[in-house]
Amino acid sequence: MFCSFGLFLVSTQQQANAAAVDKQTQTQLHDYLKSHHINGVILVNGKGSQAVTIANNETTNKKKIVKANRLFPTASLQKIVTGTAIYQLTQKKQLEWDTSLNTYFPQIDGSEDITIRELMNHTSGLVNNDRPAVPLKGQKQQIAYMLEHMRNDHVHTWDYQDVDYELLAAIISKQSHSSYNAYIHRNFAKPLHLHQIKDFSEVAKKEVPQPMDPAVDWHQVTVTTSSDFGAGNLFISPNNYWKFIYNYVLKDPKMITEFYQESQKQEVAYFGGVYLMVTLSVLTVVFQVTMLALSLITRPRK
């Protein structure tokens, strides 16, 4: 196990305020971290919609201690950022859910049969699980690698593939006539005052909590993040990620409702980077816990 970060939010469709997590639940979450020897943090909603950090340290090594204001690799938690950016473009009438991938990448096999909607809900049929030998340098190289190594299974059923969101990031860049990273900074980081967000290429090793597993080195981290363009290339502190979710995502109940409605059209209730479900008329948005080589919570080796 390397690192991970999970964010769980509950919001009604009428009111975009996450419910506060009570003290008993906070204690239970801390007990879970401790009993499973997880070195990390969990952020939950507190009074006044402020983030409450629940932390557990399994080491005294300062290089490995996880903090809420320290950069971490977002891994698949970045997908909601990319999905939200795509939603913005639909609201500006710059693209639609039914817009064909062929509009942007006609060179991709079967692109005329793949829509933005299918990229958002992982039913495109596209697959790419390859990793480069060395970190990719810049967006141009990231897109070129993605296009070279993807394949189309021509089966439009649920298949969780990062390549879907890599393509969405490339579409954001093409549609906005700027780089993907520039779009994210201009539309999210700057207005929300997110100062702890960087592309992998800007991050120094010392800025990130190091894995407890000595088998995972910085080279692996940079290789993986560099090839997860739009789906894990950004490093964000838990606090800044919280600000994005609470001050942007949950402030837009229209977007959450639309994501929910779209998610119900397939076997897995997923759309725009999140799993969604309704329980007792409450829309529950679950921001997935990602157990990948780039996460935030670290476990000691046994």
Feature-to-residue mapping (PLM):
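Short, surface-exposed loop or secondary-structure junction motifs
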Residues: I114-L280, T284-F287
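Extracellular/periplasmic catalytic domains that process cell-envelope and extracellular macromolecules
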Residues: K34-H36, I65, G110-D113, R151-D153, ...
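Active-site-proximal loop and beta-strand segments within enzyme catalytic domains
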Residues: T60-Y160
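A short, well-structured edge-of-sheet supersecondary motif
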Residues: H30-K64, S281, S295
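Ser/Thr/Asn(+Pro)-rich, low-complexity disordered segments
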Residues: Q14, A18, T284-V289
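Short, surface-exposed beta-strand/loop micro-motifs that present aromatic residues
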Residues: L43, H156, S281-L283, M291-K302
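Short N-terminal segments immediately surrounding and downstream of signal-peptide cleavage
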Residues: A18-S35
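Sec-dependent N-terminal signal peptides of Gram-positive bacterial secreted proteins and lipoproteins
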Residues: M1-A18
